[in-house]
């Protein structure tokens, strides 16, 4: 039976819309998911279409946005690509990779996307919704919108917002960020641009990131409710940033919290950075201060530097060379520096990058084969097919430990013979997952394909101890707090804060 015929049987979905990008939709959905889980419900997150290079791989090898994976953790369930059936991974110049139900199906421009992919995209969204309800008929979907639901030039082909809300007859919440100012115009303007049948779906308004004396907003609350005839069901106070921003542009505003830390880490801010959630576990280490490196500089102030993943490795390697950062990294290595590359970062640490199918940002035949930074004797060749899979392995360095994570990458990396480069060893029992070298004069160079490597507590502890030892700092013998337990604690705290200030019960019937 089609889902349309069963809509009267399902639990009323809750949909979180926003007056703009960055209004707080993702965190609101995460909080509601945990609140409902604690109430004994079966919440499942859903976002029809997301645009992000911060991705996760489910247990079937399907790519999905990391924010929906995080929301699944808040529900206490395994993430699935069905929760984010369309993922667009931007590559610059209005070009994106299109992923349907976890599988890459092509590259498109913004103009061609709406022309060629709108109808197939809506079918994929409906297919995912039907599958979710078939597998878990008693679930309650907690749906996240994208950007603003009333972009008038796009609304007729918007797959993520009001089309989904109307299809499921969802109870909708409109979230707005008072921190940005103009909250009255944002709320009224958004609602005025909706059709009457769309506005009827809005059952509550949330004012997010409120600072100061709440009593001073009493008249404002009364005015909004009188003007819209929609109750304000929550005024959420300003909270410390608990999770990474969904958009890499927001990294420019993100600062590490641990200003008295003993270990200083520099992460290279690549133009096409991906999977910056890899560094959340380091952000939660009190002994570590993270700084994002955006321009050429002397890197000696850092105890180790990280070259992160990239959506366009060739393009980002060219950027490193032209900006001078490639030379900075070499000089840092020559001065006993410690370096670790993840995925695209591993590839850039090698001697050469070859892109015969123009998959990784090369724009001409001259860019199809370029030199890497040249610190590891590795050659990477990019192929048309992308590898996405969950990983379970065992590390050989800096400790023997079980390792979990996932891979998302094009290309195969191979060792090359070189008398001028250091000999390298495998980091893991699965030999093609990463390599390292320890230089006689001091310093290490390592690279791995495993995203989520720092979520492995023992591996992270021992790598940090290796750095501490190089600084003549006492090593930590006590195990650090499990990152996954810490993540659970953060989600619980987030849900508790929302629960204090949010009347969710009115939306459950």
From Swiss-Prot:
GO biological process, one term: cobalamin biosynthetic process
UniProt GO MF annotations: ABC-type vitamin B12 transporter activity; catalytic activity
InterPro entries, alphabetized: Class_I_gatase-like (IPR029062), CobQ/CobB/MinD/ParA_Nub-bd_dom (IPR002586), CobQ_GATase1 (IPR033949), CobQ_synth (IPR004459), GATase_3 (IPR011698), P-loop_NTPase (IPR027417)
Active site residues of this protein: 343 (nucleophile), 451
Domain annotation GATase cobBQ-type: ranges: 262-459
Protein's pathway: Cofactor biosynthesis; adenosylcobalamin biosynthesis
Origin superkingdom: Bacteria
Record key words, sorted: Cobalamin biosynthesis, Glutamine amidotransferase
Keyword DNA repair part of the UniProt annotation: no
Summary of the function given for this chain in its UniProt record: Catalyzes amidations at positions B, D, E, and G on adenosylcobyrinic A,C-diamide. NH(2) groups are provided by glutamine, and one molecule of ATP is hydrogenolyzed for each amidation.
Family the UniProt entry places it in: Belongs to the CobB/CobQ family. CobQ subfamily.
Protein name: Cobyric acid synthase
Species name: Prochlorococcus marinus (strain AS9601)
Lineage: Bacteria, Bacillati, Cyanobacteriota, Cyanophyceae, Synechococcales
């Amino acid at each position: 039976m089609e889902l349309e015929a069963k809509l009267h049987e399902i639990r009323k979905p809750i949909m979180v819309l926003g007056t703009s990008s960055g209004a707080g939709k993702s965190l609101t959905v995460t909080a509601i998911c945990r609140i409902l889980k604690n109430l004994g419900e079966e919440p499942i997150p859903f976002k029809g279409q997301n645009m992000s290079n911060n991705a996760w791989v489910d247990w079937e090898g399907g790519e999905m946005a990391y924010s929906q994976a995080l929301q699944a953790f808040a529900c206490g369930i395994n993430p699935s690509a069905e929760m984010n059936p369309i993922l667009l991974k931007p590559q610059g110049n209005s070009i994106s990779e299109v992923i349907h139900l976890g599988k890459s199906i092509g590259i498109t421009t913004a103009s061609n996307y709406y022309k060629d992919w709108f109808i197939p995209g809506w079918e994929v969204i409906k297919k995912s919704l039907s599958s979710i309800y078939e597998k878990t008929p008693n679930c309650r979907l907690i749906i996240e919108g994208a950007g603003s639901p009333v972009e008038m030039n796009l609304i007729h082909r918007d797959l993520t917002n009001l089309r989904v809300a109307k299809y499921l007859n969802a109870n909708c919440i409109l979230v707005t960020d008072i921190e940005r100012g103009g909250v009255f115009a944002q709320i009224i303007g958004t609602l005025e641009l909706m059709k009457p049948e769309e506005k009827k779906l809005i059952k509550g308004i949330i004012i997010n990131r409120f600072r100061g004396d709440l009593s001073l907003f009493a008249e404002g609350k009364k005015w909004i409710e009188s003007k819209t005839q929609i109750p304000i069901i929550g005024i959420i106070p300003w909270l410390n940033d608990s999770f990474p921003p969904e958009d890499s542009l927001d990294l420019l505003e993100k600062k590490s919290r641990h200003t008295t830390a003993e270990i200083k880490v520099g992460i290279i801010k690549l133009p096409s950075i991906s999977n910056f959630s890899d560094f959340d576990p380091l952000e939660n280490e009190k002994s570590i201060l993270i700084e994002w490196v955006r321009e050429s500089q002397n890197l000696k102030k850092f105890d180790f530097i990280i070259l992160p993943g990239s959506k366009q490795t060739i393009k980002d390697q060219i950027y490193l060379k032209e900006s001078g950062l490639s030379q900075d990294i070499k000089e840092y290595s020559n001065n006993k520096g410690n370096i670790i590359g993840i995925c695209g970062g591993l590839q850039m640490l090698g001697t050469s990058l070859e892109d015969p199918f123009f998959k990784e940002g090369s724009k001409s035949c001259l860019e199809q084969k370029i030199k890497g930074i040249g610190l590891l004797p590795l050659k990477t060749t990019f192929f048309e097919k992308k590898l996405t899979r969950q990983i379970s392995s065992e590390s050989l360095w800096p400790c023997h430990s079980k390792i979990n994570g996932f891979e998302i990458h094009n290309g195969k990396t191979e060792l090359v013979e070189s008398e001028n480069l250091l000999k390298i060893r495998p980091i893991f029992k699965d030999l093609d997952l990463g390599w390292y070298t320890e230089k006689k004069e001091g310093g290490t160079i390592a690279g791995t394909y495993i995203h989520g490597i720092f979520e492995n507590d023992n591996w992270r502890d021992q790598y940090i101890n290796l750095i501490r030892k190089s600084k003549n700092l006492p090593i930590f013998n006590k195990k650090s707090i499990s990152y996954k337990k810490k993540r659970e604690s953060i989600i619980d705290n987030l849900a508790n804060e929302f629960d204090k200030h949010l009347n969710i019960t009115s939306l459950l019937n």
